[in-house]
């Protein structure tokens, strides 16, 4: 339920608020897309945490660049992969 609410808020922002503002995100994917992917992949709480952490890095003093959502750690090894 919380996951759906958070995703709805991000989609609302992407569709209705973001188009009204100049593009300023220093990252790829954008902070809103990153947050959306993080919530979809990691769930509501960890995804929201990752999204907020990313948004706090998005300022003129940070170089930005490619910054994908981190993968989940495999409990049986030290590698990461999608489930």
Swiss-Prot record:
GO terms for cellular component: plasma membrane. Its main location: membrane. It is found in: Cell membrane. InterPro entries: Membr_insert_effic_factor_YidD (IPR002696). Keywords: Cell membrane, Membrane. The keyword Translocase does not apply. It is a peripheral membrane protein. Residues 64-83 are annotated as: Disordered. Pfam families: YidD. Coiled coil: none annotated. SMART domains: Haemolytic (SM01234). Could be involved in insertion of integral membrane proteins into the membrane. HAMAP family: UPF0161_YidD. NCBIfam families: membrane protein insertion efficiency factor YidD (TIGR00278). Belongs to the UPF0161 family. This is Putative membrane protein insertion efficiency factor. The lineage of its organism: Bacteria, Bacillati, Bacillota, Bacilli, Bacillales.
């Amino acid at each position: 339920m919380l996951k759906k609410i958070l995703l709805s808020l991000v989609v609302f922002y992407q569709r209705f608020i973001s188009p009204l503002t100049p593009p300023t995100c220093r990252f790829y994917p954008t902070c809103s897309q990153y947050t959306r992917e993080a919530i979809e992949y990691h769930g509501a709480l960890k995804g929201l945490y990752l999204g907020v952490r990313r948004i706090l890095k998005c300022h003129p003093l940070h170089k930005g660049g490619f910054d994908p959502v981190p993968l989940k750690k495999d409990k049986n090894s030290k590698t990461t992969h999608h489930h």
